[in-house]
Amino acid sequence: MNTLHVAAAVLNQTPLDWRHNLENVRGAFAEARALGVSVLCLPELCLTGYGCEDAFHSANTLRRAWSALIELLPETRGMVVTVGLPVLHQNAVFNCAALLADGKLVGLVAKRHLAGDGIHYEPRWFKAWPAGVVDRHALPDGTTVPIGDLHFDVGGVRFGFEICEDAWVANRPGAALAGFGVDFILNPSASHFAFGKIEVRKRFVLEGSRAFGVTYLYANLLGNEAGRAIYDGGALIASSGKLVATGSRFSFQDRLLTTAQIDLDATRMGQARSASFRPDLAGDNAACVRAEFNWTAATQVKVVAQSSEPNGPWEEGEFVKEEEFTRAVALALFDYLRKAKAGGFTLSLSGGADSAAVAVLVRQAFAGALAELADDGVRLKLSHLRRLPEVLDVRSLTQALLTTAYQPTENSGSVTRDAARAVAEALGARHLELDVAAVHRGYLDVVERAVGRPLDWATDDIALQNIQARVRSPGIWMLANLSGSLLLSTSNRSEAAVGYATMDGDTSGSLSPIAGIDKNFLRHWLRWMETTGPVGFGAIPALAVINRQAPTAELRPPGALQTDEDDLMPYDLLDAVERAAIRDKHAPMEVWQLMQPQFPQFSPAQLAVWVERFFCLWSRNQWKRERYAPSFHLDDENLDPKTWCRWPILSGGFEVELEELRRAAGSVPS
């Protein structure tokens, strides 16, 4: 039996953080060596970080990445390793994976298919390498190495690459690599988290290993790398159609290795037995780069306990989406806190669902970090903070790093005041009350004197609502500034779609953790957190005080009985309209037709009113979406104009389409 010990690593990197990124890669090398690993696959662009954006066009970025690569070479003795970096070749930047073997740079594989949809803008920074093309890349010392569409023969073991997006396309490179008889396909990836996406990855890794008759190593990034995208890790190793090792997801560690023992003879004989396998005997030998390597010496290292971790029980349960949401946002918040070197989090806790959800997620960030890293690990991660409690537990850490404030005006009620206090107490947050009624009254007096008339709800409704939200902004910002904390805003995606928020009021903040998720899911998730909660952490029964309420902005006088859904439409309908109109790009008439069978409890005429309301509010409020604080990417329905959904600030507002809708709705019998 010809056995190799292989590993795929997930790394929590930071764009342009040269010291940390290099140390983290070195740590992966050291752990792999200690485990007796001879083949190690690291993530895409791991030396620079994936999210460098326009810094990929900085000569400094390219030089430092190359220097880091050269610095790592001696540490790869006795191993075959791949690391990702940008490479400037013939005045074009390519997204490359460098293959290092026994202390030498063997070659550079350039990515063939660039990710240019969703949050990805790779074609802005990189050029796609053409299939079948091989060149020589000049090194600073005057020597050259192969670059391009390469595969490798390292001491008789053959390696090929699919770099992230390469594996997601129909004509993936693996088919040609199979013809060259490769033993391993290495996939260094930077695949951001989205709900359910792990299952897609598993399918192409498994199918690639089966169809190509290879062992497939999939490495990924981990954590909140650059602010918006969350990477869940989840390394995968498959061989001949079987998943042989999986790594855990949403880890708070800097890195994790997933390892496996691979029987090289078994995979080769599998290819030999396959009637459909056709070796490419006339293939271009220039594409195969050969390097010497002593596998006998490499495999003589004693193999110790493997460091790969199986999927947690939460991934097998019935609440996978709820668990993914909780763990993804918790990890993203913790990483944002430490990478921004902030003093904590500050939050205006209104007593409603959105701010309660944000507070719970902050507490979950601390709970998750402590559960995995323990006291010493959390202190190390938060070493920028001068003062942490002597005894670290979830409650003491939340008390130290989360400040909440309830800010009532004369239109606030005891229900929300009591709910805010109850949630803060249950979570352990430091809770304050800032009564802004006098500030609110002061603005009304100033404006009424200026315009020469009293303001009235019948004629000045929006202005009177918005000023209440805006007077809450200066005080909560001041609290955040006192401790150098991140102010968290609480708008959700449903509100962002229709602009149901006060700019410079409840949108105030440095980070908007839930702006990527819809209100309907948030309400469901809060009920789940009240009764069930994530595996290993449990429920928060105190959320019952939130879940009993109907969502309300609480900006009109108490007698008005204001609710969000009266102002807008039912939230489940709003989310369905948003998906049809924005994600799927249907016209107003088409959206109206789609909604009728989905919501038969409402008349066609009423649905037409709500569909028109959505399109009007959507078009009118793009300027607000442009100004929202950065939010986390969670699925394919994101409205972030910087990374996902671009829309003109000024447009025709669907006037012609909505006229057609009104005519059609008017002709339908009621």
Positions of PLM-derived features:
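ATP/NTP-dependent adenylation/nucleotidyl-transfer catalytic domains that generate, transfer
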Residues: G155, V214, E225-A226, G247, ...
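Enzyme catalytic cores with a strong preference for nitrogen-chemistry domains
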Residues: M1-S348, A359-L388, A426, H431
